[in-house]
A protein has these predicted regions:
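Transmembrane beta-strands of outer-membrane beta-barrel pores
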Residues: 43-49, 77-81, 86-92, 111-113, ...
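Outer-membrane pore/translocation modules
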Residues: 26, 102-200, 269, 311, ...
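Bacterial Sec-dependent N-terminal signal peptides
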Residues: 1-29, 219-221, 294, 298, ...
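Predominantly the C-terminal beta-signal and adjacent terminal strand-loop region
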Residues: 249-250, 254-317
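Residues on the lipid-exposed face of transmembrane beta-strands in outer-membrane beta-barrel proteins
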Residues: 41, 71-77, 105-109, 147-153, ...
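Outer-envelope beta-barrel architecture signal
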Residues: 33-39, 69, 78-80, 112-116, ...
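Surface-exposed strand-loop-strand hairpins of Gram-negative outer-membrane beta-barrel proteins
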Residues: 46-70, 81, 85-96
Length: 317
């Protein structure tokens, strides 16, 4: 955490040393900032939770992590975004959760109209609830890695303006965005004499649609949703190995403010993966995400700009 914080602070300090010459370019629909580095600090509430529905016995069980809030730091330049988060103990949602942790890392890149995301969730310390009863399980760990590959059909629609804001939507537009999602999840339970491991792999494909509403020159409201279908393969979650149909859904709502150098907003998103782990048991794998953020843009070093321009020219991007 200390190293990442120092890097972000260094970027902000260097930004004040650079001249404030306007480096943005515009067209009718999108304002871009090709020669700017965007830095952002955010307060995030997120987790990877699991709900088990035992249809045969009409029972419902929830497994939710103790730690759900963290501070996030982001750095964006051209097509690359890197996010890092950590969970301070002094947050109300994280208090009294000794031996619990949440580590979250997100990477997003844009290559032309293609968008690639990579998500990582490493969690320790859950509580198990059923029939209004709650039990703390400090020995439960989960590790999830995966992401999505998407294609943005409408060149006049800016996905980068939704929360990430190294672009800005200057005229309302929407786009069809087909996506393929894939996640690998590993579970580890240690409790007294119990030491059990399980895993799950998800892959699904489906359509998405997003629309950016330009309320004023500086304010944006965005809505979007994705629905898909695919396959899940689980090992040792239910009755040994089990393969079933996977249904996935995601939704996003964003409110953003933007100026040449300063930006801020609220970014909300949810991902739901539903599948069976045996013939009569359904598992819902959910990742809710709520973020409040502020950010600042400054001029990128000339060497970075030249390197990016040379790369784009070489590969025709």
């Amino acid at each position: 955490m200390g190293l990442i914080f120092k890097i972000v602070m260094l970027f902000l300090f260097c930004g004040f040393l650079h001249s404030q010459q306007d480096s943005l370019t515009t067209n009718e629909y999108i304002t871009t900032f090709p020669n700017k580095i965007s830095t952002r600090i955010s307060l995030v509430n997120t987790s990877n939770s699991f709900i088990i529905n035992d249809v045969a016995n009409n029972a419902k069980y929830e497994l939710k992590p103790n730690v759900r809030e963290y501070l996030g730091f982001s750095v964006l330049f051209r097509s690359i975004e890197i996010d890092y988060g950590f969970s301070p103990k002094f947050f109300n949602a994280n208090k009294d959760n000794d031996n619990s942790r949440l580590f979250n890392l997100n990477i997003r890149t844009f290559l032309g109209q293609w968008m690639q995301t990579i998500d990582l969730y490493n969690q320790k310390g859950f509580y198990f609830s059923s029939n209004n009863q709650r039990v703390n399980l400090s020995g439960v760990k989960t590790f999830k890695i995966g992401g999505s590959t998407s294609y943005i059909f409408n060149k006049n629609f800016s996905f980068r303006a939704i929360g990430f804001q190294n672009e800005w939507q200057t005229k309302s537009a929407g786009s069809f965005v087909p996506s393929i999602y894939y996640y690998y999840t590993k579970y580890h339970l240690t409790l007294e004499d119990i030491d059990e491991k399980a895993s799950s792999f998800d892959i699904a494909v489906g359509p998405s649609y997003y629309y950016n509403f330009c309320l004023t020159k500086n304010f944006l409201f965005s809505l979007g949703a994705h629905a898909g279908v695919g396959l899940n393969h689980s090992s040792n979650l239910g009755e040994g190995d089990f393969t079933s149909i996977l249904y996935d859904f995601s939704g996003r709502a964003v409110v953003g403010y933007n100026s040449d150098t300063f930006f801020a907003g609220i970014n909300s998103n949810i991902i739901l993966l539903e599948h069976k782990i045996d013939a009569s048991t359904v598992q819902d794998d959910t990742i809710p995400f709520l973020e409040f953020y502020i950010g600042y843009r400054f001029n990128a070093p000339k060497k970075w700009i030249k390197l990016a321009d040379d790369f784009n020219k070489k590969y025709g991007l």
